[in-house]
From Swiss-Prot:
Required for CpsD phosphorylation. Involved in the regulation of capsular polysaccharide biosynthesis. May be part of a complex that directs the coordinated polymerization and export to the cell surface of the capsular polysaccharide. The gene is cpsC. One of its GO terms (cellular component) is plasma membrane. This is Capsular polysaccharide biosynthesis protein CpsC. PANTHER family: FERRIC ENTEROBACTIN TRANSPORT PROTEIN FEPE (PTHR32309:SF13), TYROSINE-PROTEIN KINASE (PTHR32309). It comes from Streptococcus agalactiae serotype III (strain NEM316). It is a multi-pass membrane protein. The chain crosses the membrane at residues 25-45, 181-201.
Length: 230
C-alpha cells in the first residue's frame, strides 16, 4: 500500500515538473518583469545616497608615555565601544545640528551615521550617508569634530588623532542596482513558480488515461482521437 502511495506521489511530482517546464517561458517572463521593476525602482524611484567616511585613533588615557602593550590594545578596544556611544550621543548630534544649521531632529541625523570599530584596533570609523555628496562629507567631518571634543571632555583623553578626513564620494553607495535587479529576478521566478505549483496541485481535471483509471476505477480500452485534428 505504501509503495503504491509513494508511486503516486512520484508520478504527481513528475507531472508537476512537466507542467512547470512547459511554463518555463512564463516563469522567465515574470522573473524578467520583476527584475525590470527592480531596475526601474533603483534608477527612478529611490533617491541615491552618498557615504563619506572619516577615521580617528584614540590612545588609552592610562597608557604612560604613549607606550602601547597588548594589554593596552585590548583595553583600548573596550574603550572604543564607549567612544562609539559618545559619538552617537544626543549632545554630539545636537552640536552638529546647530553648527550645520540642519532643519531635522537628532533622531534623523542618527539614522545617517554609522560608527564602526576596526577589529583589534582603536581605530574608529565614522560614516555619514546623505543624498548630497558634499553634505555627507561635511557632516562626517562635523560629527568627527564634535565627537572628538566630547570624548576629550568625558574621558580626559587628549591624544586623539584624525587618521582620515571625510572624503568626497564620487559615486552613490546606495541603492545597489545589481542587487535589486537580482532580488527582483529571484522573487519573480519564485512567486510565479509557487503560483503554478499551487494551481497544479489544485487542478483536479482529468487529463490522462491514468487520471481516468484513478478517478473512475476503470481500465482504458483505447483512445478516441480528436477528429478536428485529423
Amino acid at each position: 500500500m505504501n509503495k503504491i502511495a509513494n508511486t503516486e506521489v512520484e508520478i504527481n511530482i513528475f507531472n508537476l515538473l512537466k507542467k512547470l517546464w512547459k511554463k518555463k517561458f512564463l516563469i522567465t517572463f515574470v522573473a524578467i518583469a520583476f527584475a525590470t521593476a527592480g531596475l526601474f525602482y533603483s534608477l527612478f524611484i529611490v533617491t541615491p545616497q552618498y557615504t563619506s567616511s572619516t577615521r580617528i585613533y584614540v590612545i588609552n588615557p592610562n597608557t604612560p608615555n604613549n607606550s602601547i602593550t597588548a594589554q593596552d590594545l585590548q583595553a583600548g578596544s573596550f574603550l572604543a565601544n564607549d567612544y562609539k556611544e559618545i559619538i552617537t550621543s544626543t549632545d554630539v548630534l545636537e552640536k552638529v545640528i546647530s553648527s550645520e544649521k540642519l532643519n531635522y531632529p537628532s533622531s534623523q541625523l542618527l539614522q545617517k551615521i554609522t560608527v564602526s570599530i576596526l577589529k583589534d584596533t582603536r581605530v574608529i570609523s565614522i560614516s555619514v550617508e546623505d543624498a548630497n555628496p558634499k553634505m555627507s562629507q561635511k557632516l562626517a567631518n562635523s560629527v568627527r569634530e564634535a565627537a572628538v571634543s566630547k570624548i576629550k571632555a568625558v574621558t580626559q583623553v587628549e591624544d586623539i588623532t584624525t587618521l582620515e578626513k571625510g572624503n568626497l564620494p564620487k559615486a552613490p553607495s546606495s541603492p545597489n542596482i545589481k542587487k535589486n535587479v537580482l532580488i527582483g529576478f529571484i522573487v519573480g521566478a519564485g512567486l510565479s513558480t509557487i503560483v503554478l505549483v499551487i494551481m497544479g496541485i489544485l487542478d483536479d481535471r482529468v487529463n490522462t488515461e491514468e487520471d481516468i483509471e484513478k478517478v473512475l476505477g476503470l481500465t482504458s480500452l483505447g483512445i478516441v482521437s480528436d477528429l478536428n485534428k485529423l
